[in-house]
Regions:
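Helix-loop boundary and gating motifs at the non-cytosolic
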Residues: 2-64, 227-268
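Hydrophobic core of transmembrane alpha-helices in multi-pass small-molecule transporters
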Residues: 24, 92, 104-122, 320-338
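Loop-to-transmembrane helix entry/capping segments in MFS-fold secondary transporters
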Residues: 48-49, 136-149, 261-262, 351-363
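Helix-to-loop junctions at the C-terminal end of transmembrane segments
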Residues: 65-78, 165, 278-291
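C-terminal ends and interior cores of transmembrane alpha-helices
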Residues: 87-102, 301-318
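Glycine-rich segments within core transmembrane alpha-helices of 12-TM secondary carriers
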Residues: 144-165, 364-374
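C-terminal membrane-cytosol helix-exit motif in multi-pass small-molecule transporters
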Residues: 189-208
Length: 378
């Protein structure tokens, strides 16, 4: 079975492999910023409310431009947008690092806003590109591999950050490089900049002229709005719930069970590995058990894990409380994430070809909105 699963991913179109490498490279930067950028900001003297305000700007960038982009790219080639994303994200990442280092607040704000825009370009364009470049036989594999890049980048970035922190410094003659947050972020940003080499090698066929929508202001009749809202309503509920809970899970374990950042990082590494494995199993499960089992049942189990984790606060003084909470946490994330590839495939097929770019943009906007609200709540 494992050999069959491996071959199904190996036999994907070359452009999908290039897109996956592009997503992985940019995700390295994204993960590194999530893991240590806030620590870097705090060490530079910024308060927690200021840090939350900076982070909210990257979601504003995605919120403001995702919907217009989704309308604009219908029927257009997506390679130029991937190239633009691979230029914007590393450049604005460097701008964030240096503006934080020198405490230039206006530049920090501009860089966060632009960084969010760059990541949004990749996210909004990836889903329709995958659907365009695959068939019904291998679209689940492509979407699953795309979903797995985030967890793989989490593992790789986490190991690299921990390794460089453990080494401490590098001496070459009279030159010494200290591996602090500033230098580590720069190293990973340079690694992420290699994404441009994958973007320029992507090839696309001609798109149908009849699918193009060049008028951003005449969209009422261009899309099946009732179908779109029906399709996206479950995602609205899931994104709101995730945005209001997941960003604070580390605080929950710290305040209720006394877990340190090191302990929680270890849990994060375990869950990232499981997310990667579970994501790769999605095509096999979807083809064997169908969408109902792969999406509805799996997400219901993930929600149950979240509820169990919260209930364990009532039993924090008992030794079994933390054990059950940790098990629920480790299982929740892989279960919820393994439903995403199948859900995205079902969503794109349900809304039809002419609505796919817009539904991808709306999906990105919803997740950005949920994290923006979380940043403001914090």
């Amino acid at each position: 079975m494992l050999g069959k699963i491996f071959r199904s991913y190996r036999d994907l179109p070359r452009v999908i492999h290039l897109l996956i490498l592009l997503e992985f490279s940019l995700s390295l930067i994204h993960v590194a910023f999530i893991l240590i950028l806030n620590i870097f900001l705090r060490k530079q003297g910024f308060s927690d409310p200021e840090i939350a305000s900076f982070n909210s700007l990257r979601f504003i960038g995605a919120l403001a431009f995702a919907l217009p982009l989704g309308i604009y790219i219908r029927g257009k080639k997506l390679k130029p947008f991937f190239i633009l994303a691979t230029l914007i994200v590393p450049l604005t990442s460097g701008l964030i690092i240096e503006s934080v280092q020198h405490q230039v607040v206006p530049l920090i704000q501009l860089a966060f806003l632009s960084w969010g825009f760059g990541m949004m370009l990749m996210r909004v364009c990836s889903l329709p590109f995958i659907i365009r470049s695959t068939s019904a036989e291998n679209s689940t594999e492509a979407l699953s591999l795309s979903a797995a890049t985030w967890s793989l980048a989490t593992i790789f970035s986490g190991v690299l950050i921990s390794g460089l922190d453990w080494v401490g410094y590098l001496t070459l003659g009279v030159w010494t490089l200290i591996f602090d947050e500033h230098s580590i972020l720069w190293i990973i940003t340079v690694l992420g900049a290699t994404s441009i080499f994958f973007a320029v090698r992507i090839t696309e066929g001609e798109q149908e002229d009849t699918a193009r929508n060049d008028d951003l202001f005449s969209i009422r009749k261009s899309y099946d709005w009732s179908l779109i809202f029906k399709a996206i309503s479950p995602l609205i509920l899931i994104s709101i719930g995730a945005g209001l809970t997941i960003p604070f899970v580390n605080l929950f374990f710290n305040s209720v069970f006394g877990l340190t950042s090191s302990n929680f990082s270890l849990l994060g590494s375990i869950t990232a590995f499981l997310v990667f494995i579970f994501s790769l199993l999605v095509p096999f499960l979807r083809k064997k058990y169908g969408y109902w089992m792969t999406i509805v049942v799996v997400q219901a189990l993930a929600i149950c894990c979240l509820v169990i984790m919260a209930i364990m606060e009532l039993y924090a003084e008992f030794s079994f409380g933390i054990v059950i909470a940790v098990i629920a946490f480790i299982l929740r994330q892989p279960l919820m994430h393994m439903a995403h590839p199948a859900a995205n495939e079902l969503l794109m097929n349900y809304v039809g070809k002419k609505n796919q770019e817009l539904i991808s943009a709306l999906s990105s906007s919803l997740w950005s909105a949920s994290w923006f609200v979380s940043a403001k709540v914090f």
